[in-house]
Amino acid sequence: MKLEMTLKRKNLALIALIASTALSGCASAQVGVPEQAATAGRDTTTHMAPVTLHADLSSKMLAVKRGGETIKTYQVAVGQDRYPTPIGTFEIRRIVWNPSWHPPPNSEWAKNKTPKGPGEAGNPMKVVKIFFKDPDYYIHGTGDVESLGSAASHGCLRMDPDDVADLAKLVMTEGGEPREENWFWRIIHFRREEKTVYLDSPVSLTITD
């Protein structure tokens, strides 16, 4: 009887050991697979969008090009002599619809100006702003459309509000973040909602004088 009990205990111990080893092996496999899957086949390269933007400060025009061919042009207002628009090539990665506006700190022209919320009267950004150089350089709309074609801004590129909305839609689509028309309908009809869109593929903007 004692011999039989001893054999049973040994068998139970052996079964427990085998089960423990099997579970340990499964746990190792579960940990290993995600680590391999996390990097396998991932492309971490930044892909630029197929269209490019080109702003010429002397002609006060902004062109949209694809493969060297101009597909759209817009008239813009550029920076005044005291507040020049930066020259160079920049990457557009962010667009804000119904943006709020805060007076740029340490800017003489912005003294005594008060912040404006999304869609608020007197908001100089209008319906959309397209970031091209941090912290405060954008392509945005203007209520003073008569200033287009002149050097009137504080460094940004100003456009007709309808034109800049058209441009922002195009940039979003080409940058891999398209939206349905009902999304834009909501933006236009609910002006107090600020929406930020980050592009999957940056769009290049080159500014020359």
Q: What residues fall within each predicted segment?
A:
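N-terminal pre-domains immediately preceding structured catalytic cores
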Residues: 2-209
